């Protein structure tokens, strides 16, 4: 099946792409929703649906995979917040509809890779959009044990760093920029102590993938800046702004030919 992958830059969307390929599907394009830069100043958008921290690096992520990237600004807001989503003009879900509609027209996709693990809210809305577009959602991580998933992601050579923290026990000064390998023991400890979701499904943390087996090149962070979003005494919310990055060749990578060269489509 020809598949477009919904990506945030994080570990979950990356690992779900790997599962799609393992099941015999072909990832032909990447799709991403970004903040409308004319309307918001912060990288962290108040969205029920989308991870936006790290959005500045998405173009490089697509270049690392040598796949076409389709992006759309999030112009809507969370208006229809009921358990079951019904089509609502001005809702942020309709931005996803317009984005995937464009990708389907351009790339003739049949399915969509979705990295949802636990959120019925997100999954139901993606399914609503896919049904309207006659696309098959592929969510291989859905309701998997999070400790198992984190272990598998690390074992699968997904190199991801923490770019947002928002939970009791996570310290911006200590944990922003740390890798999954470095954080795994501590995340397991926080899970036992405070019930923190090991994969961050409760919004406790977010990640950005710098390398994985799907990348033709790896992403290197040259400089970054910690930004305090909410200085809560017990669970401060902070994120890492990736200000300068570059791609490096991987020792075992094969250069992409002209047919798979990266192209970017924005709306």
From Swiss-Prot:
UniProt entry tagged with the keyword Phosphoprotein: yes
Pathway(s) this gene product operates in, as recorded in its UniProt entry: Protein modification; peptidyl-diphthamide biosynthesis
The keyword ATP-binding appears for this protein: yes
EC number of this enzyme: 6.3.1.14
Single GO biological process annotation from the record: protein histidyl modification to diphthamide
Gene Ontology MF terms in the entry: ATP binding; diphthine-ammonia ligase activity
Sections of the chain in a coiled coil: none
Keywords on record: ATP-binding, Ligase, Nucleotide-binding, Phosphoprotein
EC class (word): ligase
UniProt-recorded name of the protein: Diphthine--ammonia ligase
Gene: Dph6
